[in-house]
Amino acid sequence: MKQIISFFAIAAISFSAMTGCAQDKSKRPSPPASVTVTTQKGVTISIHYSQPSVKGRTIGKEIAAFGEMWRTGANEATILEVNKDVTIGGKKVKAGKYGLYTIPTEKDWTVILSKKSNLWGTDNYSQTDDALRFVTPSAKSKAFTEKMTFVISPAGKVSLLWGDVQVDFTVE
């Protein structure tokens, strides 16, 4: 009888430890978000990311430093997925999942798709794994966006909106 009670006590403690450790990702300071759109040309584009907030910081200085590689989000790597072979930034890209990284500067951002989509941050990033790299201009957005947000139009225009910054590129 003591063995049965001990077993159930250990099981209950283990279960509560596991559920206590399981993190509700929606309650993170930079919560997860996703956007999926099927374009007019039948390409399904999905972006899975976490949304860092500006919180009064200056983009390019206190957050997403100019000239430095950035994971383009927070927490896990940002993932861009396409269901068909496409052209992005004038370059061909095969259907699949890619890690989305950027190098922001004041006037433009370098957009990078890495063949490795399972990285955390930029620590294990290697340029040899790039599937694509191109530069696109940044602009002042029409409205301030506190939490970084991706928007995809039916024409395949991908827009990163964050603070007063807007970075666009097209998936065709």
Question: What is each PLM-predicted segment?
Answer:
Residues 9, 41-43, 96, 107, ...:
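Residues at beta-strand starts and edge strands
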Residues 13-15, 55, 103, 109:
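Alpha-helix termini
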Residues 71-119:
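Mid-length scaffold segments of soluble, non-membrane domains
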Residues 1-25:
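Bacterial Sec-dependent N-terminal signal peptides
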